[in-house]
């Protein structure tokens, strides 16, 4: 392909319709046809990154391979396409404004009055077009967060308007809207979609494709009506109905010809329709799984999206283990040594989830103690691994006040501490270990059994580390094996309790690197152990 083509995905009527899934599905379908693609997300909020947003309100903060904090939709992009994301796949209003203000302070605008148009919109356009200038992608798919009509999103839509005018048929807009069903009337209503498109048109953008999100199937007549009233070709109107699994969406979009419509609009040959054989095999295997395993997620956020990547990784691995993973949220604030048996009852395995702050910390320790003492299949992630170490120090070493410096800076036994060379750094965000780091795994351990190799690379997102200088030897003598370490610093990345069948903790976040076709080896081994234990 001579020149990069651009696909802009916008949303209307309501939020949370699944723009991220549609963007990822488009990427998957074009990738299957041999095109080199990338997907990026522009979020209208003024936070520079999602790292400071409350997971209870916004969902998880996803981490790219270079350690950038990103929206959870980037997880969908990676899980669908197997393409690793970086800081260049995620932007916010706050980040763009910050960069423009920095340029103004450096005098790069030569005394001009800095305004939303052209300076902010030009910066947005530069970010949107980076994929065509740096890495030469065939298609750059850009998702715009929020809905049409939000005041925060206007600069992004203006940038799209300008790019569509400048690029001609090299730029298309895919607009996702909601078609509500009125049960009293027994009708699907297209008027909200018409108004959403009209609002987009009033901003100078004519959508080229419409994806109609609905709970009931639309008739051909309704689809033609929408096409006619919205100035869109009939073959460019597709439906996105509720499906049992998000991984069926690319197949449904392909069946309705969304990828061929985009190719036609951008002047590319249609060619033969890809079979998507591995993907279809995964979906069928998922449908045919009969066995059900129940896994408890021990955490403090009851919003499902707060642990989105963990949910998806466990679900993917369940498919490859021919079982359906049923997840149960267990509020760690309700767990004590006295209540653990009742609160944790009935699960086949447990994940002690990552998190920050003291709320729910003691409950996680009680959960870890119960799981270890009862030889239950358990995976600790991030803070979950730190909890495992603190619990062993309290119960097995007798250090009753043992804790993490994050939770108790007065403790005399800092089992988990901030790295020594980072204690003088004033900005807490400057002390975080984020992104890809190597880990060397000791042979003969459960971690090695999971990965099958000595050196691995996983994504980290944490500030505190196991205090290896003071406590590693004692913990290992008590049975907590440090089976994976960073090769240069000696920092402990993986622990496992040798007396248990499978009780493993990782300081890194294995769920971030788990995709549909390449699931996380550690999460896979955990689900396999859970399934085998159930029989």
Task: Go through each PLM region and give its residues.
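Glycine-rich, charge-decorated loop segments at or immediately adjacent to ligand/cofactor-binding or catalytic sites
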Residues: 182-189, 386-395, 497
């Amino acid at each position: 392909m001579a020149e990069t083509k651009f696909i802009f995905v916008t949303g209307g009527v309501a939020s949370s319709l699944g723009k991220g899934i549609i963007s990822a599905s488009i990427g998957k379908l074009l990738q299957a046809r041999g095109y080199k693609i990338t997907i990026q997300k522009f979020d209208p909020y003024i936070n520079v990154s999602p790292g400071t947003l409350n997971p209870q309100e916004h969902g998880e903060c996803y981490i790219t391979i270079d350690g950038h904090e990103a929206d959870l939709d980037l997880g969908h992009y990676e899980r669908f396409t197997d393409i690793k994301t970086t800081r260049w796949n995620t932007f916010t209003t706050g980040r763009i404004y910050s960069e423009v203000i920095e340029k103004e302070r450096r005098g790069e605008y030569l005394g001009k009055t800095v305004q939303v148009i052209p300076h902010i919109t030009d910066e947005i356009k530069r970010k949107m077009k980076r994929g065509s200038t740096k890495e030469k992608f065939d298609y750059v798919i850009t998702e715009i967060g929020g809905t049409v009509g939000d005041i925060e999103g206007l600069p992004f839509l203006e940038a799209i308007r300008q790019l569509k005018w400048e690029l001609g048929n090299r730029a298309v807009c895919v607009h996702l809207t909601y078609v509500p069903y009125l049960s009293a009337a027994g009708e699907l209503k297209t008027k909200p979609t018409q108004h959403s498109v009209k609002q987009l048109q009033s901003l100078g953008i004519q959508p080229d494709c419409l994806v109609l999100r609905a709970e009931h199937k639309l008739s051909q007549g309704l689809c033609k009506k929408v096409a006619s009233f919205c100035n869109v070709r009939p073959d460019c109107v597709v439906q996105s109905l509720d499906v049992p699994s998000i991984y069926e969406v690319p197949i449904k979009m392909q069946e309705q010809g969304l990828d061929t419509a985009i190719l036609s609009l951008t002047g590319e040959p249609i060619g033969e329709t890809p079979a998507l054989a591995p993907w279809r095999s995964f979906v069928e295997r998922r449908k045919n799984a009969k066995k059900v395993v129940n896994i408890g997620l021990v955490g403090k956020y009851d919003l499902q999206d707060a642990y989105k990547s963990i949910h998806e990784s466990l679900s993917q691995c369940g498919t490859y283990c021919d079982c359906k993973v049923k997840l149960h949220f267990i509020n760690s604030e309700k767990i004590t040594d006295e209540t653990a048996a009742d609160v944790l009852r009935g699960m086949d395995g447990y994940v002690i989830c990552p998190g920050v702050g003291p709320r729910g910390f003691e409950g996680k320790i009680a959960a870890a103690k119960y799981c270890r003492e009862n030889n239950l299949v358990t995976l600790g992630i991030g803070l979950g691994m730190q909890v495992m170490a603190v619990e062993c120090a309290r119960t097995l070493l007798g250090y009753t006040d043992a804790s993490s410096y994050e939770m108790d800076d007065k403790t005399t036994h800092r089992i988990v501490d901030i790295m020594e060379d980072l204690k003088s750094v004033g900005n807490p965000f400057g002390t975080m270990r984020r992104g890809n780091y190597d880990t060397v795994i000791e042979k003969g351990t459960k971690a090695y059994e999971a990965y099958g190799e000595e050196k691995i690379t996983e994504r980290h997102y944490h500030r505190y580390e196991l205090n290896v200088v003071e406590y590693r030897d004692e913990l290992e003598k008590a049975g907590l094996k440090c089976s994976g370490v960073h090769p240069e610093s000696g920092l402990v990345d993986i622990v496992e309790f040798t007396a248990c069948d499978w009780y493993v903790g990782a300081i890194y976040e294995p769920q971030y690197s788990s995709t549909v076709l390449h699931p996380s080896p550690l999460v896979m081994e955990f689900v396999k152990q859970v399934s085998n234990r159930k029989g």
